[in-house]
Amino acid sequence: PSAGEVELAGHALGELDEDRRARVRAEHVGFVFQSFQLLDSLTALENVMLPLELAGRADARQQASALLERVGLGQRLSHYPRQLSGGEQQRVAIARAFAAEPDILFADEPTGNLDSQTGARICELLFALNRERGTTLVLVTHDAGLAARCQQQLRLEGGRRVAAAG
């Protein structure tokens, strides 16, 4: 931005060095990517455990297992991403994103690579976890129906805001 400040959890991000910004992101921000971004060499359980272990959580295995159970993958803990369907991979990514209990979660086209039925289930899961955990959800989508479910919407065209609702 050319003016103003960005604050997250009481931290003025522009005043922090890169290491401190990375720490704030790790402690307060979660991401769900359209392309899942799972580590191929790790199982579903290990992918979800990773941010918990990096945060020094002694209960990483239990928390990751519980989250995978919550997203319906309790029987797929030891499966690698290549052994999972697109919808299953996205559910692992969602579990990983919520693992560290972020204050804010950015979801970039979370249903973009999924068929409509799987996409609808993923949306239900995202909104359910959002409500249960009190996480602020910032959702980027081209799906007008999905956007309509959000409390607030911003519409961009050519990189500029053209409308706001909610």
Task: Please provide the spans of the model-predicted regions.
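ABC family nucleotide-binding domain
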Residues: 1-156
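H-loop (His-switch) and adjacent beta-strand-loop-beta switch element
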Residues: 153-165
